[in-house]
Amino acid sequence: MNVEKTAVSADDMALINQYSRAELSADDVYSFKMVCCDSKIDRDGEAFSVNALHEMAKLFVGRTVITDHKPSAKNQIARIYKTHVKENNGFSQLIAWAYIPKTDTNSDIITLIETGIVKEVSVSCSVRKRICSICGEAFDACHHRKFKDYDGKTCYCTLDEVMDAYEVSFVAIPAQRGAGVTKQCAMYNVQCADIELKIKMAENFLFCLDNFYDKGDFKNEIE
């Protein structure tokens, strides 16, 4: 199970009350922990590096928990108040603890968590590097392809250097088999110069195309 209820200690309440304007007690909150993601290769042929998990452990503290990656104030369910990277049989897991205020509005989601209906979670973050497991180069720049075998080694993409962590969501279909995670990892804009160059090239192409039509060259070419 990827989400499970946890007891709330005095130390937990001290962390939780950092995010609350009203002083809360253990009776006021429902606390649970989640396996957010791990270092195993997922169904997309990607894997977080152990370094990335530790970076996310720092960044996700204080982040909100929503559903289906729909960012709105009304869609906020819980807030993460502590995290931990756990070693587990040769791979690493990012564990997060979150709390939900016990209110009439939140009673339904608490029931769904308690009964195991809502238990898969998803992380949304941005990463700086996507590294090929075969050659160690930037994955988008090399010729290797995910899931293909090269000299007996299956290619996958390692996600590394997490730049920001946005939120954790409850989802229906997981990508990571063990952790039950559907991830959304946008590439951080570290290739801004290259992107700007491509934009310039596209603008120049459109400018030339406009001139081509204005001069009637297109018509002459058809004739």
Regions found by a protein language model. Give the residues of each.
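Signature of dsDNA virion morphogenesis modules
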Residues: 1-223
